[in-house]
Amino acid sequence: MQTWDAIRARRNVRSYQTTPVPDADLNRIAEAAWRAPSASNRQHWDFVIVTDPDQLRALSAVWRGAGHIAGAAAAIALVVPTTDDDRTRLIDYYDLGQATYAMTLAAADLGIGTGHSSVGDQDRARKILGVPAGHDVAFLLGVGYPADRPLRPIAKPSRRPLDEVIHHGRW
């Protein structure tokens, strides 16, 4: 798939086929996160690829919106150092947003769906993943082949009209 087609085809997938995602594809998706830009090239992140069904089921309970993780072929946990500094947290989470989007596009390019989730229960998430103290599991990204329909460019996405959100020169 070409980049523009991947951008147009990407959507949040919350229901997955039972087909496993090949390790090479999971590694490529994670590499997209590794290649994402970060503030001052700090790379305050780590990524944990999870394919074990028991771990996926356990992770689905760390946030009320993470139920889809249980049915995913895999999940990628996005981990950052714990900080009390608001500016550092803001920058780190912005960087994770870029890494997440890079992964969603890399996955879409392969015909693989993704669905993101926050993490509420840090202690539980750290225990499931073996994440050391001093780090937070910020987000989860469910990964798998869509159960409903393949990824294809969406002609009319459910979005606010483009001319309402794009401004030139001034608001």
Regions found by a protein language model. Name each.
Residues 25, 52, 126-127, 133, ...:
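Short Asp/Glu-rich motifs
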Residues 33, 76, 84-128, 141:
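Small-aliphatic-rich amphipathic alpha-helix that forms the alpha element of a beta-alpha
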